[in-house]
Amino acid sequence: MESCSVAQAGVLTSPFMWRWTGMAGALSALDNTIEDDADDQLPCGEGRPGWVRGELLGSQGVCKDSKDLFVPTSSSLYGCFCVGLVSGMAISVLLLASDFRKLDFSRPEPCFEKEASLWFVAQH
């Protein structure tokens, strides 16, 4: 059974201010990274998806028209997930801290991708 617990909890719970990177398309295609127009440093709001939604959608160009933002409780520090409009088409967008690789997050936990995929299917 896969665990969605957060390792390195002492590091992750610090109030980091992260710049967000948007990854559009398939959730597994993390090498296809697009830098969104995110000039603001956005806090990754652990356990506060409503607050994250307001901050994130106000600053993220690719998700500015999104009505929903999915933040799994177990993985909220790894990133968020939303549906955004790109060239007029609604696509899934995975949002991660731009320095997530430096923080030794090679990719989001598998449970994050699974939960996000199920959420996306339920919304459409």
UniProtKB/Swiss-Prot annotation:
Provide GO CC annotations from the record: membrane
**What keywords are annotated for this sequence in UniProt?**
Membrane, Transmembrane, Transmembrane helix
Name of the gene this protein is made from: COLCA1
The membrane topology of this protein is: Single-pass membrane protein
| Disulfide bonding pattern of the chain | none
Name by which UniProt lists this protein: Colorectal cancer-associated protein 1
Query: Which residue ranges traverse the bilayer?
Result: 77-97
Please tell me in which tissues this protein is expressed: Expressed in gastrointestinal and immune tissue, as well as prostate, testis and ovary. Expressed in lamina propria and eosinophils but not in epithelial cells. Expression is greater in benign adjacent tissues than in colon tumors.
According to its UniProt record, where is this protein located? Membrane
Q: Which domain of life is it from?
A: Eukaryota
